[in-house]
């Protein structure tokens, strides 16, 4: 598949075997926004399979802001590739009931650890030296990123549908509810 996944980790220390380098800028972002809704893409090590990155040379990493999730990741002892629990192209669920409504009959179990505190995806960024490129807007804003890094830009692929996705959430439409709409 050419659609990269996010590898979830329990803390910033656990990314070391997964990447070939962590710049001071990337470390500053992790120190400021992890755990939380920030996904950082970094050059991947040989331990990360191409199917997890959509064949890209970078891996998307996130440390979720949920104690139960981080405990699960710690006990698993490996990163977990975890897309949103929804049908691709549909809005991301914020409660177990949302997951049930969207995925009913498609999955065997739902782990209900309470509702999400943020109803949007994580912000996905690519770090180059002291510059941050937003690949997918989400729970961390450009202004918040600029409190840590002086140069923050939006990726041009956000407005060009022909570009190969560089990060999770760029290939398919997000926030696409199945509802009628009237334009007045």
Where are the language model's segments positioned?
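Active-site-adjacent structural elements in enzyme catalytic cores
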Residues: 1-184
């Amino acid at each position: 598949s050419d659609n990269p996944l996010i590898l979830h980790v329990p803390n910033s220390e656990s990314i070391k075997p997964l990447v070939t380098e962590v710049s001071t800028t990337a470390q500053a972002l992790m120190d400021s926004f992890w755990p939380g809704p920030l996904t950082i893409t970094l050059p991947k090590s040989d331990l990360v399979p191409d199917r997890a990155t959509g064949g890209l040379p970078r891996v998307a990493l996130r440390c979720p802001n949920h104690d139960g999730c981080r405990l699960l990741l710690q006990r698993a002892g490996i990163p977990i590739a975890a897309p949103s629990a929804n049908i691709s192209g549909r809005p991301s669920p914020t409660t177990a009931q949302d997951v049930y409504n969207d995925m009913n009959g498609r999955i065997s179990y739902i782990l209900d650890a309470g509702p999400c505190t943020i109803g949007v995806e994580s912000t996905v960024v690519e770090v180059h030296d002291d510059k941050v490129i937003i690949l997918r807007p989400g729970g961390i804003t450009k202004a918040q990123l600029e409190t840590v890094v002086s140069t923050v830009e939006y990726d041009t692929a956000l407005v060009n549908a022909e570009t190969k996705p560089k990060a999770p959430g760029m290939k398919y439409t997000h926030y696409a509810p199945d509802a009628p709409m009237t334009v007045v």
